Amino acid sequence: MNLYKRGLVVGKFCPLHQGHELLIKRAQDACEELLVVSYTRPEFPGYEPARRERWLRAQFPQAHIVVLDDARLAALCAARGVPARHLPHNDDDGELHRHFMGWLCWTVLALPVDAVFTSEDYGPGFAQVLERHYAGGPVAHVSVDQARAQVPVSGTLVRQDPHAHSAFLSPIVCADFVTRVCVLGGESSGKTTLAQALAAHFETAWVAEYGRELWESQDGILNYDDLLKIGREQLRREAQALLAARRWLFCDTSPMTTYFYCVEMFGKAEQELARLAEHRYDLVLLCAPDFPFIQDGTRRDEDFRARQHAWYQAELARRGIAFVNVSGSVDERVRQVAQVLAARMPC
């Protein structure tokens, strides 16, 4: 039997870490309903409301999730016919934050609580303020791992270097901090070899080219409808690989390549495939066609490779996508990419 009717957990969740998850799970176990509120002012880059909401909803689908910025708060106030307020600043007095939450739960959300769960020393005072706002009964405070003995981490610590503290993050949260690197290139330009070599060098995951896998499974025959299937499956596998990647994910091809082949083979492409081809990466590598051309029975010829390489150059420029040219041997290419990635890492 649940001890409380409706519990409350409040936090920035920038990012959502295992300490937060422990707190929310304990609250869920003790309550019939749970209200989870996230806000921060100012926002932290990379921890936008939509992202925080996605994490919370994925991990706690049964909870009532409210993630706020000033615009979202204004919309809630308008829907209730309540004069809008601004979110309190993170540096404002704690009492102001507590009264803000009392107003939010009672006046804006109409969701009074009878318990608040925290890992902070302000918890008892928070419960007292909420109780005064509701005037409908006591509000209990439940402390969870205040000493950080079970989960020795904080949001401030994780923000300094999410990768160094990835053990305290769920895979869905870690995935949003992975740098996605796409490797493009014409046929027999070494892109698959490079993607594999980079994954081995950086001890992380890579995503193979699904189109080739399907082509081989269908005895070298691809139909028009297969190309959209390839684009969808390539991105599905990419999203799955993000959950296992460490800092970087290397992708052998992208839906833009699938789009190229669809138009090349059939003279047209579905609108959905064109949209999938807009999928963006954090870094794009374009392999120079300076490898000896190897005919493995699936490829065309060197002239086609050169034309495909030129198409990539023109199409990336047309889409406003910056890219890094890589050339030389596999080892030389790995060194080139390592230098680029090192320059992108925080000091």
Positions of predicted regions on the chain:
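The conserved Walker
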Residues: 187
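Nucleotidyltransferase catalytic core that binds NTPs
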Residues: 1-179
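Conserved substrate/cofactor phosphate-moiety recognition/catalytic segment
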Residues: 196-240, 337
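Conserved nucleotide-sensing/catalytic segment adjacent to the nucleotide-binding pocket
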Residues: 220-268
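A glycine- and Lys/Arg-enriched "phosphate-lid" helix/loop adjacent to the NTP-binding pocket
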Residues: 266-332, 336
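Short amphipathic alpha-helices and their capping/turn segments at secondary-structure boundaries
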Residues: 23-27, 53-54, 193-201, 229-244, ...
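Conserved glycine(s) of the Walker
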Residues: 190
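Charged phosphate-binding loop/patch that engages nucleotide di/tri-phosphates or the phosphate backbone
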Residues: 160-181, 313, 318-347
